[in-house]
Amino acid sequence: MSSRSIVSGVLVVLLLAGSAWAHHNMSAYFDFNNRVTITGTLAKIDWRNPHIELIVDTKNGEKVQPFRLEGPAPGFFRDRDVSRADFDGALGKAVTAEASRARDGSDWGLLRTMMLPSGKLVSACPQNC
C-alpha cells in the first residue's frame, strides 16, 4: 500500500470523526442552563433514528406557534418502557414539556421531560434531568 493511500485514509477517518463529534455535541446547539417549559398540543411525532422529533403547538395570544423538540433515538425510549404508542395517544392533546432551549433562541429545544395526558412522565435524560 502506498504512503499516499495511507495518508488519504487517515485524513478521511479524521474528517469523519470530527463530523460525528460535532453532530453529537448537543451543547453546541442547546443551552443546558436555559430551561423552558412548553405547554401546548402535541401536533406531530417523527419517530425515527437518530433522534425523535416532536412538534408542540403553543399559543402566542391568538396565534399558534409550533415548538420543535428533539429527543433521543427510539431505542432509548424502548429501553425505558416508553413506546411510540405512548406518544400516539397524546396526539392532538395537551402536553407539558421541559426542554433546554436552542442557543439561537428559536422555538427549538432538547427534550428533557414530557408529561403525557395519560399521566405518564416521560424522561429523555440518560440520568436525572
PLM features per residue range, with description:
Residues S8-S19:
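Bacterial N-terminal signal peptides
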Residues A20-V36:
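Short boundary/loop segments of OB/S1/cold-shock single-stranded nucleic-acid-binding domains
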Residues G40-L42:
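Conserved hydrophobic positions within beta-strands
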Residues R48-K59:
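Short aromatic-glycine-enriched beta-strand elements
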Residues G61-A73:
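A short macromolecule-binding patch
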Residues P72-R80:
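Short, structured beta-strand/loop micro-motifs enriched in basic residues and often containing a Trp
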Residues D79-A97:
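Short nucleic-acid-contacting surface segments enriched for D/E, G, S/T with interspersed K/R
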Residues S100-Q127:
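OB-fold/S1-family single-stranded nucleic acid-binding modules
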